[in-house]
Amino acid sequence: MFRKKKKKRPEISAPQNFQHRVHTSFDPKEGKFVGLPPQWQNILDTLRRPKPVVDPSRITRVQLQPMKTVVRGSSVPTEGYISGLLNDIQKLSVISSNTLRGRSPTSRRRAQSLGLLGDDQWAADPDMYLQSPQSEHTDPHGLYLSCNGGTPAGHRQVPWPEPQSPQALPNGMAAKAQSLGPAEFQGASQRCLQQLGACLQSSPPGTSPPMATGRRGVKVAKHSSEEARPQSCLVGSAIGRPGGEGSPSPKNQESSLKHRLFRSMFLSTPATGAASSSKPVPLPQNKPNSAFRPPQKDSSSNLVAKAQSLPSEQPMGTFSPLTTSDTSSPQKSLRTAPAAGPLPGRSSPAGSPRTRHAQISTSNLYLPQDPTVAKGALGGEDTGIVTHEQFKAALRMVVDQGDPRLLLDSYVKIGEGSTGIVCLAREKHSGRQVAVKMMDLRKQQRRELLFNEVVIMRDYQHLNVVEMYKSYLVGEELWVLMEFLQGGALTDIISQVRLNEEQIATVCEAVLQALAYLHAQGVIHRDIKSDSILLTLDGRVKLSDFGFCAQISKDVPKRKSLVGTPYWMAPEVISRSLYATEVDIWSLGIMVIEMVDGEPPYFSDSPVQAMKRLRDSAPPKLKNSYKVSPVLRDFLDRMLVREPQERATAQELLDHPFLLQTGLPECLVPLIQLYRKQTSTC
């Protein structure tokens, strides 16, 4: 009667509507897994592919955390305590602070930062080691900019006019700067003032501190008392006032520091020397000073040439962010200040579906003809230091406002590259699938190349170029939302099957259409390979991966950076010679070999060995040349020419007889379907 009832055991039914969609197994003959889910397969394939490389000397150094002074024990600070502590700090290796387009430290500076050279040896002639021999060789006329000041006592500069209204700043810079929020901007200024006050209070009362230690551990000489300006811990010394004014009041000091901080965060140097002032100040050629003019309006095409310029000829810490430094000849690219009014910027590309205005204002760059003039303008100080927050502020001006995490969901990682990862996401409001490229700003080899991901794809739109929808700054990451091409990369296809000549011609014609358009706008892709070619399910071919591209112009007609993927690099890139758009044609020729043979030349060699063979040997040949027609061999020979001047252009190749075999995009659909079938089933 009172016995406890047994609970009924729950009945578990068999699965309903069960479908065995995924079955993963290992093929011992091929030595690989088969039947993996697409996102897993993409990750494995990505890890096997060679990664693009960047010149190691151009890798952006990570900004060091500010050093905290810890006083232990019962030591009582004396009059020389602070100065002695600063001398000890100066011997620490803090020379690797983050700079945009900064040159690697010279051997002299590395020895100084490690304490191998004494202070007296450095103070004997510090200006001798401000530039490396390479920079003096490539820029004999002295390409200098003192964006944040930096003149020794007695050397005056023309002051930068204070912006009185939003109309005073070009390209809508005032509106963009206000979008950052007054609290954020004022907070940065207050931190700068607090650091400045700590530096000034470290000296005994009544005396001026003999030396000020910058962030990079390099001594900066103080000016005389009648010309002394407050030293910003972020942007270096100030620009001297005209008219022989004395020391400014504390209120003027604060406003001046805020102004210089604003300029260091948002102003850059263009490739042109045009001035926007109606009354330009001529540049004296025989006096040891430099003249500067207000910012000018600039097109977004010239912006990229400034933002992603080659860093090989630029000394560390001498330029402000987003400067151009690659030049083919000093006579053509280095110009003195013009005496006339502004020059019109290059108009938007003719083939672009929509026109956008540049969102970064730029200042003018003037080149003194006498190297001693530039040295006097710099005053032996490091002026081009860009902190992580300043770089984020500059990047924030070219991206869209908002938080994409509120608009997207269902993230699935589908790939990984040298700059970040790629995820597949779904838009909440439309249900459309988009590809999201997420790049951590702190983990970039060259963070300034991130501007390419935004500016190039935004301003240059073409039927054969992957469309970019939006770009956002999410915390410490740059998110770029692009169209999702479900056909995958060309690499996936050619690794499984071989293309016939009609299919090869169809791919080449689409890529050449994109290159002809980009080259006409002065854009060099610099990473053409099968991984950068994406396909849609209906067989359309599109060019992607603009993270390593560069822009050339009349003022910067050539580049010199070692950028690209080793097996596809042109000989002139490997040999560090000046190059232009011809390097993309060579890489396309290597990609044609890849479509015929299944892999690029020298793929079994190490990347370094392959680069040596590409640089020193004759142009590579097809392994199976007997399998292709003579017209395809001639098409390939027009691209793989060692002399860039003799190499065919993209427009010339579009008229080649081989492209008469070009078929409709549907001819590539069987290849896409075959690959998807092989990766989804055993």
From Swiss-Prot:
Pfam families: PBD, Pkinase. Residues 12-25 form the CRIB domain. CDD domains: CRIB_PAK_like, STKc_PAK6. GO terms for biological process: learning; locomotory behavior; memory; neuron projection arborization; neuron projection extension. It catalyses: L-seryl-[protein] + ATP = O-phospho-L-seryl-[protein] + ADP + H(+); L-threonyl-[protein] + ATP = O-phospho-L-threonyl-[protein] + ADP + H(+). The active site is at D527. GO terms for molecular function: ATP binding; protein serine kinase activity; protein serine/threonine kinase activity. GO terms for cellular component: cytoplasm; fibrillar center; nucleoplasm; postsynaptic density. Residues 1-30, 132-170, 200-256, 270-367 are annotated as: Disordered. Autophosphorylated. Phosphorylated by MAP2K6/MAPKK6, leading to PAK6 activation. Residues 26-407 are annotated as: Linker. Interacts tightly with GTP-bound but not GDP-bound CDC42/p21 and RAC1. Interacts with the androgen receptor AR. Interacts with IQGAP1 and PPM1B. Belongs to the protein kinase superfamily. STE Ser/Thr protein kinase family. STE20 subfamily. This is Serine/threonine-protein kinase PAK 6. It comes from Mus musculus (Mouse).
